[in-house]
């Protein structure tokens, strides 16, 4: 496929990314956090009006929705409610005595240079760098690896607040132009402009209301996908419908773009367009959500329609990796839950004519990239990356040796390339960029960051535990070396468990304040993810979703049973689908945790499909519109399962511009929780203003949010921090 890439935003999500990193640097003096008894600040929850008349009917089930009015996030009364909730939350946080110390430490350890792997486009190399505390990474380029480094786009200069991100979404085949995608305030909406690479000047081409698209260049323009212009005031909440594919010719207004594909019968389908590297075929992928997708193709032209279906239905996932010598090379899970690579002649696409290039293995084939006329196949073996090199006949030539257990990514390039680049990271291994010589099979360090703590102080273990139904699950445990298993360690348990997503070892400085203060950071591998293939995914989706919650609860019970921690010192966290995970587990087992952090979570399982792109999650969750699924969803929907009982200290996090998981989910959940909390622990919501779902959040905001979360956790565990 045509090589396209996006800048790697150095975004350290407060709960998603993981621990540790290296360098012989100044070390903060700490010991284990001291047990103390803090006095809870006095606070009063804002009054939240209940509309007793708001009731929805799902078949034979009537469901009260008293906080429905909070769904209108642009309404004056909702904005006032947001201000009142934030006033209570930040008033509480302001009274935590060590909050500033944690923020200062985070600012110190964030201040290190980091970079992405370079992407080669003709003679140019593009990459991002962040000098340390820059709000957004800067996109650089140079002509040749030893050429002069120049700034291509500096988001920090274009937006002083640091809330805009920029990335290359496609480079023209003559390497003269780059299409740039801009996202503001964390929104999924993308504004596409074009820059001439040599002069680094904008051409004036401007494309609005793009979402989930790259730019596939062809001749003097490119193919892309967009939505119709949304109604004013509904840009961040209205359901997105009729995703269409267009061709934009350089120098013409968007209104003159040529419609290439639309589906008037299926208004909720996504449509993405690509181009094979040899420019012979347009490849259209259609999806109804996050399950699988159809693949269609046609010889390249600018006519509407005319596509031939290669893979039909949305039950499988297949993507064309390359087209060479008249064959499509396809990465697919058809008849291979752990995926395989096959060669398909488009004139004889029937399955009996396929040629297996890389057969299915007992381990998950996590992806296949091409560079220098080779396939780079990435496998997951017990949630750790292993990469093997194959020729186009399927002969395995070598393995790319990794520094240890961790996660590798990259290995993209063009057929004529003699080198490729990749990144490697782990919990205690800072993200390092390697250059790989395709001819010799040798790797060398290209960029290694220097961080302000010693990774040798920490250790990583992978343990296995048993879930409720007997399923065996792995979990990573990160801590200082020699930590005592006495049940008194402040512990944060994180997981995701959904959408076939792989949660693999990664690197972040966010967890350092926990580890430096004698804490433990744990990442549980749950069903619903993709770490062990499609069967593992299916075991945690739709009517099997309870398995995910059971896996997470079992992980917590394991940590308590093995005395890593206890109920008094255990916090749980997750974001997005992981926010749903935390919401469900804290309503099912409120007795098991001391602190809960549901972040940007899907909390109303009866209505999620009615907002923005929520309809795309129906294949994963099911729908309240389905008579076979609505009662199951209602049975675990966090908003609908808050009882009049004692709940742990909870800080919900969301953002007012989140157009992926709209903030109404979190608003309604916290309103219900504040209403029904029978204990004394605080139930607060931290609402980020002028921010979105998380991607591209400015470094300054990340530091503030992470500091607030650690402060809230340590304070409610009665643990002091040992920073001077």
Segments predicted by a language model, with ranges:
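A flexible loop/linker signature enriched in serine peptidases of the S9 family
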Residues: 130-137, 159-163, 182-191, 206-211, ...
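Beta-propeller blade signature
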Residues: 141-142, 193-197, 239-251, 296-300, ...
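C-terminal motif of bacterial Sec signal peptides marking the signal peptidase cleavage site
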Residues: 16-19
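Cap/lid segment of the alpha/beta-hydrolase catalytic domain
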Residues: 156-172, 181-187, 201-203, 436-442, ...
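Active-site-proximal cap/loop segments of hydrolase catalytic domains
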Residues: 523-724
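Bacterial signal peptide processing site
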Residues: 21-24
């Amino acid at each position: 496929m045509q090589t396209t890439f996006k800048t790697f935003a150095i975004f350290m999500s407060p709960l998603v990314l993981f621990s540790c990193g290296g360098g012989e640097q100044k070390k903060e003096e700490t010991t284990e956090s001291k047990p103390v008894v803090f006095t809870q600040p006095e606070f009063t929850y804002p009054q939240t009006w209940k509309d007793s008349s708001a009731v929805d009917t799902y078949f034979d089930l009537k469901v009260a929705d008293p906080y429905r009015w909070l769904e209108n996030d642009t309404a004056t009364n909702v904005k006032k409610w947001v201000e009142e909730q934030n006033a209570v939350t930040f008033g509480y946080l302001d009274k935590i005595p060590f909050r500033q110390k944690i923020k200062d430490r985070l600012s110190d350890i964030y201040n290190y240079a980091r970079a992405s792997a370079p992407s080669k486009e003709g003679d140019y190399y593009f990459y991002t760098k962040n000098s340390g505390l820059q709000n957004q990474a800067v996109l650089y380029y140079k002509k040749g690896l030893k050429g002069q480094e120049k700034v291509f786009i500096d988001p920090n200069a274009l937006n002083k607040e640091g809330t805009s991100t920029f990335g290359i979404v496609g480079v023209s085949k003559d390497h003269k132009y780059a299409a740039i995608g801009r996202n503001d305030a964390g929104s999924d909406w993308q504004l596409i402009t074009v820059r001439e690479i040599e002069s680094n000047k904008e051409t004036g081409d401007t494309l609005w209301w793009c979402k989930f698209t790259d730019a596939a260049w062809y001749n003097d323009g490119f193919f892309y996908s967009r939505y119709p212009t949304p109604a004013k005031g509904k840009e961040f909440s209205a359901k997105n419908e009729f995703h269409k594919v267009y061709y934009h010719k350089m120098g013409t207004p968007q209104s003159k773009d040529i419609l290439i594909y639309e589906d008037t019968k299926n208004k909720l389908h996504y449509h993405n367009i690509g181009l094979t590297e040899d420019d012979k075929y347009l490849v259209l992928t259609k999806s109804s959500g996050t399950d699988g997708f159809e693949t269609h193709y046609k010889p390249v032209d600018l006519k509407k329609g005319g596509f031939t279906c290669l893979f039909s239905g949305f039950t499988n996932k297949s993507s064309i990796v390359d087209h060479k010598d008249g064959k499509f090379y396809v990465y697919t899970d058809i008849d291979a839950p752990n995926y395989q690579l096959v060669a398909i002649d488009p004139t004889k696409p029937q399955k009996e004519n396929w040629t297996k290039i890389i057969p299915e293995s007992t381990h998950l084939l996590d992806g296949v990239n091409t560079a220098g006329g080779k396939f780079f196949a990435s496998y997951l073996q017990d949630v750790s990356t292993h990469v093997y090199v194959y020729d186009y006949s399927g002969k395995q030539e070598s393995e790319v040796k990794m520094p240890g257990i961790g996660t590798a990514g990259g290995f993209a390039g063009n057929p004529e390339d003699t080198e490729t680049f990749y990144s490697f990271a782990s919990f205690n291994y800072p993200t390092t960029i390697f250059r790989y010589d395709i001819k010799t099979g040798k790797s060398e360090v290209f960029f290694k960051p220097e961080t302000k703590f010693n990774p040798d102080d920490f250790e990583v273990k992978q343990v296995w535990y048993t879930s409720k139904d007997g399923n065996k699950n792995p979990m990573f445990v990160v801590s200082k070396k020699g930590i005592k298993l006495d049940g008194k360690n402040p512990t944060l348990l994180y997981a995701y468990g959904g959408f076939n997503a792989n949660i693999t070892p990664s690197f972040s400085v966010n967890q350092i304040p926990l580890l430096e203060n004698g804490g433990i950071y744990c990442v549980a591998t749950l069903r619903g993810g993709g770490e062990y293939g499609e069967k593992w995914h299916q075991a945690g989706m739709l009517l099997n979703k309870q398995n995910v919650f059971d896996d997470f609860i079992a992980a917590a019970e394991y940590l308590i049973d093995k005395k890593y921690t206890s109920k008094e010192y255990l916090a749980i966290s997750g974001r997005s689908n992981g926010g749903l995970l935390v919401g469900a587990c804290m309503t099912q087992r409120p007795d098991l945790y001391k602190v809960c952090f549901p972040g940007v979570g899907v909390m109303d399982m009866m209505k999620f499909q009615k907002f923005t792109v929520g309809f795309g999650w129906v294949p994963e969750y099911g729908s309240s519109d389905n008579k076979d699924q609505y009662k199951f969803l209602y049975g675990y929907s966090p908003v609908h399962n808050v009882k009049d009982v004692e709940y742990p200290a909870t800080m919900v996090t969301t953002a007012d511009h989140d157009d992926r998981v709209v903030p109404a989910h979190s608003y309604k959940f916290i309103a219900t929780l504040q209403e029904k909390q029978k204990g004394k622990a605080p139930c607060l919501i931290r609402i980020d203003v002028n921010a979105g779902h998380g991607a591209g959040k400015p470094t300054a905001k990340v530091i503030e949010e992470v500091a607030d979360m650690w402060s809230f956790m340590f304070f409610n565990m009665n643990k002091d921090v040992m920073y001077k």
